[in-house]
Amino acid sequence: MALHDQPLDIGDVYNSRAESYDNSWHPRFARHMVEIAKLKPGEDVLDLACGTGLATLCASTAVQEHGSVVGVDISGGMLAQAKHKLQSHDLNNVELHQHSITDLDRLLALNGKKFDAILCCSALVLLRDPGAAVKQWATYLKPGGRIVVDVIHPRDQLPGITFEKVGKRCNLPVPFYRLNFGAGSGDLRQMCEDAGLSRISILSVSQIDRPELVDLNDFLTDLDAPRPSTRHLGRSQIREEAKMLFKDEWAKLADEQGKIKQVDCVFVAVAYRS
C-alpha cells in the first residue's frame, strides 16, 4: 500500500462533508445506536468518531446532568458542527476533543478515565486495523461496561467497497477498510472476542431504511471530479485505468443492466467487559 496518513485522509474526507453530513440517514441511525446502548442516567459515555455530535447529544440527554459524555473525532470541521449544537442546546455534561480514535492513550484528557459505555457509530470501517482499535477501546471500559459498534453488510454501500478494491489493484490509498469485514457479523463478533469482551450480541438493523438500486455511471463521475475519498484514483495519470478497473469489479456484482440492488443492513455489536 502506498504511504499515506490514514487519520489525515479521514479528516479531509469528513471536513468536506461536515456542513451537509446531517442531511442524510445519519441522524436516524445515530439515534438508533444510542437506543441500542440503553444508556442510563448518571453513566459516563465515550463517543468515538463523534462527528457532528449526533450520538453525542442523544447520549447527553440519556445520561442526564449527573452523567457525562466525551466525544472524540479527527475532523475539525465535524467537531465545529458538534460544538455549535452544544452551544445551542446549552449542554454542560459534554466535552469534545480533536484526536485520532486509534491512539487514545495519547489523549491526555482520557488519562485515568473509565466509561460505562463506548459508542462508535459508522466509523469502524474507516480504520486500517480495527481489531487493534477495539482492543484499546476495551481498556477504557469500567467492569461491566459495554461497547456498541457497527459495520455495514458486505452487500451494502457497494460503490465504496468497489473503490477500495480498485485502490488495492492500483496500489493507491482509499481511506476506508471494509474488506476487513468480508464475513460481516462473523468478523465483528471475532473482533470483540479478540478484545477480551464477552456477552456479545449482534443485531441486524436498517441503515437507510429502504432498498437501493445503484448505477455504475453514477459513481464513475467520482473519478472525473474526485471527492477527497477518491482523490488518489482521480489523478489524471491513473483516472482512466481506475475507471476500467471499477467497471471490471462492478461487473462481478451487477446484473445485466449494470445495476446492483444493495442490502440495507448494518450489524451492530454490543459487547461487555467482564
What name fits each language-model region?
Residues M1-A18:
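N-terminal, positively charged/glycine-rich alpha-helical extensions of SAM-dependent methyltransferases
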Residues L3, T52-L54, F181-S274:
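Conserved Class I S-adenosyl-L-methionine
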Residues S24-E43, C58:
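Conserved alpha-helix/loop element of class I SAM-dependent methyltransferases that forms part
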Residues D44-L107:
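Class I SAM-dependent methyltransferase SAM/SAH-binding core
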Residues E65-H66, L141-R146:
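Short glycine-dipeptide loop
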Residues D105-I118:
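A short acidic, Gly/Pro-enriched loop at the edge of an enzyme's catalytic core
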Residues D116-P130, H153:
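A short SAM/SAH-binding and catalytic strip from SAM-dependent methyltransferases
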Residues G131-A132, R146-L213:
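Conserved catalytic/acceptor-binding region of the Class I
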